[in-house]
């Protein structure tokens, strides 16, 4: 097999950012499970395996300038882009390597507090999975955390053959991969319309195919068109990672910690009767029909004493990361649609609107008077899982990190003059990426340059032959585009800009 071992190299992966990779988010999960976490205000070492274009690693390195970040990807084009972004931002604490997993282990690397890998485990050969296990065994510290996400059974059971169909269709063509993807999607849709038994007997595939047609083609190239493509039962992954002396700690997807919104009473009862913890996770995946897991494994667990755990929970600091008016109490969970209690969630949001608070401070806040500690705790876990809140640092630490995140954000915003690929900016307050689209980034640039926002954005777009598309219709005239941009700027200045300022982004 060639050096790329069946992995798609014809087009680069997307500039994605994955919030589960944030050290603060991973440490929160550890605390919820009553385990001691690395001290994130001191030096620590962090490694991302298969970092793609390095966007997540670069962003996180800017949020934690006291730490050292390392990452590999065997696609040289990805590493060139990752290093270029780091150089442009002046980020000195991040190191990228265009090594395979087998080669990377031979570099002069430290022992790591965190090793993370997003999705790649499903797209590589058994030999490369073994190389990852070997790397983790040698390079993770005792007490270190490993984040691994992967396609999961039984959730992929129905759709897995559809991926195989599209991959095989693409094999029969020598056209560029993006063209093969379009034709494979069309061919699959024709089979659905022709009522092939596979589709008629698996009705969940129709909406899934519709969703695929809407997705970024560069993402589909890597998600659906690798020669190696696997979905795993949880126990299969856990067994492979045992060789690296890893034990399952819990999920990085925080909603998983609240059974009340995931499982019926009957399911919870049956699950509680499963005594083997590994098999219990497998059974849980059957109840939820899980198709993607976000797991945290640890090499050795240091449990907190009950009083230590209570103190750690009380010291957890949270910040709102969305405008308060955008928060919806009606939410869709695995168990179905749930209306979150307004008398609990609304006061918490109002208290956090003024700035980050610890769980202990929230308990004493006048706005949350009468809400029990357990209700506060569960609400914050759910809101963080949804993406409304996020763990935060104190003001002193935020100020220490402001310079490095400003430099990273400046590099990204400058790129927005030419591209919409980079859609996250770094927040020193919450130590993670916040979604900020191209129009918003251009408005921030206009503000910095003391220029009229709508006019500045229109000059950039029109110089590139671009026009605003509103509700599926292209706005043709300059007046129409400027009018729309004025409305966008007004809404941005009223809601988003104050939030971004609090998050240390604007």
Curated annotation (Swiss-Prot):
CDD domains: AdoMet_MTases. InterPro entries: Methyltranfer_dom, MeTrfase_reg_dom_prd, SAM-dependent_MTases_sf. This is Uncharacterized protein sll1526. SUPFAM superfamilies: S-adenosyl-L-methionine-dependent methyltransferases (SSF53335). Pfam families: Methyltransf_31, MethyTransf_Reg. It comes from Synechocystis sp. (strain ATCC 27184 / PCC 6803 / Kazusa). To R.prowazekii RP789, RP027 and RP028. The lineage of its organism: Bacteria, Bacillati, Cyanobacteriota, Cyanophyceae, Synechococcales.
């Amino acid at each position: 097999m060639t050096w790329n071992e069946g992995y798609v190299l014809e087009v680069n992966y997307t500039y994605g950012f994955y919030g589960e990779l944030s050290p603060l988010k991973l440490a929160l999960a550890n605390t919820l499970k009553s385990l001691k976490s690395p001290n994130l205000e001191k030096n620590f070492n962090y490694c991302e395996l298969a970092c793609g274009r390095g966007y997540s690693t670069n962003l996180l390195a800017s949020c934690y300038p006291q730490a050292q970040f390392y990452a590999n990807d065997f696609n040289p084009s990805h590493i060139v882009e990752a290093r270029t972004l780091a150089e442009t931002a002046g980020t000195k604490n991040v190191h990228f390597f265009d090594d395979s997993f087998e080669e990377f282990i031979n570099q002069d690397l430290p022992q790591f507090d965190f090793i993370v890998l997003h999705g790649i485990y499903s797209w590589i050969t058994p030999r490369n999975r073994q190389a990852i296990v070997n790397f983790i065994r040698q390079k993770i510290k005792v007490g270190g955390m490993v984040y691994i996400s992967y396609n999961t059974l039984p959730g992929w059971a129905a759709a897995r053959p559809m991926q195989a169909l599209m991959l095989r269709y693409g094999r029969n063509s020598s056209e560029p991969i993006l063209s093969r993807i379009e034709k494979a999607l069309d061919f699959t849709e024709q089979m659905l319309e022709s009522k092939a038994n596979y589709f008629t007997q698996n009705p969940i595939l129709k909406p899934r195919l519709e969703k695929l047609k809407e997705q970024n083609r560069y993402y589909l190239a890597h998600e659906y068109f690798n020669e190696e493509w696997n979905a795993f039962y949880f126990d299969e992954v856990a067994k492979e990672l045992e060789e690296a002396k890893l034990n399952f700690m819990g999920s990085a997807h925080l909603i998983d910690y609240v059974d009340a919104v995931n499982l019926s009473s009957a399911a919870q009862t049956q699950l509680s009767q499963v005594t083997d913890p590994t098999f219990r996770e497998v059974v849980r995946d059957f109840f939820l029909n899980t198709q993607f897991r976000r797991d945290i494994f640890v090499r050795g667990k240091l449990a907190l004493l009950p009083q230590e755990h209570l103190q750690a929970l009380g010291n957890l600091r949270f910040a709102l990361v969305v405008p308060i008016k955008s928060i919806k109490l009606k939410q869709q969970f695995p168990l179905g649609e749930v209306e979150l209690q307004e008398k609990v969630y609304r006061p918490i949001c109002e208290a956090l609107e003024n700035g980050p608070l610890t769980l202990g401070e929230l308990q004493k806040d006048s706005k949350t008077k009468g809400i029990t500690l357990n209700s506060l705790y569960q609400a914050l876990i759910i809101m963080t899982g949804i993406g409304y809140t996020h763990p935060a640092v104190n003001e002193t630490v935020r100020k220490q990190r402001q310079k490095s995140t400003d430099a990273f954000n400046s590099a990204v915003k400058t790129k927005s003059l030419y591209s919409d690929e980079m859609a996250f900016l770094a927040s020193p307050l919450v130590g993670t990426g916040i979604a900020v689209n191209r129009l918003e980034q251009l408005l921030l640039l206009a503000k910095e340059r003391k220029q009229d926002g709508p006019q500045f954005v229109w000059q950039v777009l029109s110089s590139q032959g671009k026009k605003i598309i509103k509700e599926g219709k292209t706005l043709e005239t300059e007046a129409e585009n400027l009018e729309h941009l004025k409305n966008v700027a007004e809404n941005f200045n009223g809601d988003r800009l104050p939030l971004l300022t609090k998050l240390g982004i604007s």
